[in-house]
């Protein structure tokens, strides 16, 4: 196992390097940049994130047409006409764009190895402080969603396996598959319209993680307020998230039920409940429990972004989204580095969990 762990840890380095390199090249090739963002603010042509994404930025389009039609402009930045070139050079030095791309990339990697992510371009904070500030929101959302999905999926999968082929199995499979096919952000919008938009019911808060004056509440009231705000975001992610785990639990149980040791246990006169909970459950749950780290990372990656944006939860997903829109490169690459490193680490932990709970698995020899 030691050799396998060392090999996997060493494999993280080139994997992380490749992911960072590809994304760095894509970002460099993409139009726009932090200097152009600052120019748009300086000239008063900047718009908010929604306008840029929806394509309604008519001011920027007009500026681009003017830039392309003016043959005397030597600036390589859109909207920089009339701005002192010396000022642009100062901006390049301030943001580090006076150096070639490969030197900036190597310097960035060297800083990231020491977990020095620099300062945000447009926020008066260090990137590490920003990430640490937003991390509890994303972890809370991902962790509670994962726990609720496991709490629902495992009993449902066991019940489907016991009643395999029944009408309950058919209809429950239809429901979970349909729920899995609908994106979580559609559920989020539907829940807002129904339960917090004021159109039908106004039972839950529309945005945020806590109410104003949360610190002044009693300990129990703070817990209630916290889950009151998390109810709709978690529900929107849980509805479409338990299909895969439910079917995995069902298939794992069906595979174990048909094995010889179950037939032997029944032949000895053990009750069906004793057979299922005392023998089948322990073996069938190995693959389900071992997949918890990977499931948590998957939910954190795929569900957090849009859910945080829709419900205005100030977490890593919303931070990364704003960084991409505003071309805040330090926050963008730091978020990418953090999520990639977390994903690779949790994947290793998941594999090690398999080995711990099932000694038959040997990743060194690739045998079971």
Please place each PLM-identified region on the residue numbering.
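Alpha-helical transmembrane segments of integral membrane proteins
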Residues: 2-3, 136, 144-168, 184, ...
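Internal alpha-helical transmembrane segments
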Residues: 1-29
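Residue-level recognition of pore/gate-forming positions within transmembrane alpha-helices
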Residues: 12, 20, 43-45, 177, ...
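Cytoplasmic juxtamembrane interface segments
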Residues: 3, 47, 53-82, 155-179, ...
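Residue-level signal for discrete positions within transmembrane alpha-helices
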Residues: 12, 134, 138, 174-177, ...
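Membrane-water interface segments at the C-terminal ends of transmembrane alpha-helices
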Residues: 22-31, 175-208, 236-242
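Hydrophobic alpha-helical transmembrane segments of membrane transport/permease proteins
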Residues: 18-100, 200-222
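An internal, D/E-rich "acidic patch" concept
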Residues: 66, 79-82, 86-154
